[in-house]
Amino acid sequence: MLNMGVVLFICLVLFPLATLQLDADQPVERHAENKRNLNPHERREIIMLALRGVNCCHPNLCIGRSALGRKCTCCG
């Protein structure tokens, strides 16, 4: 009887806990896979937007300074 209890405990408690940990890893892998399939042109646009920074003013409205009083990085 004790052996059957141990087997049931392993099958009903420990095995599901082990599989839940594996399920938690899948969304991260899917996200990384989606990033790899990104078009290189789209990836460049994302990087360029990040490199421009927060203080960049809109080129059409540029008067040489951003709202924080610093020099614009996009229009000099």
Swiss-Prot record:
Coiled coil: none annotated. Disulfide bonds join C56-C74, C57-C72, C62-C75. It holds the Pfam family Conotoxin. It is found in: Secreted. InterPro entries: Conotoxin. The modification Cysteine amide is found at C75. Keywords: Amidation, Disulfide bond, Secreted, Signal, Toxin. The keyword Protease does not apply. One of its GO terms (molecular function) is ion channel inhibitor activity. Residues 1-20 form the signal peptide. Expressed by the venom duct. Residues 21-55 form a propeptide. GO terms for cellular component: extracellular region. The cysteine framework is III (CC-C-C-CC). Classified in the M-1 branch, since 1 residue stands between the fourth and the fifth cysteine residues. Belongs to the conotoxin M superfamily. This is Conotoxin reg3.10. It comes from Conus regius.
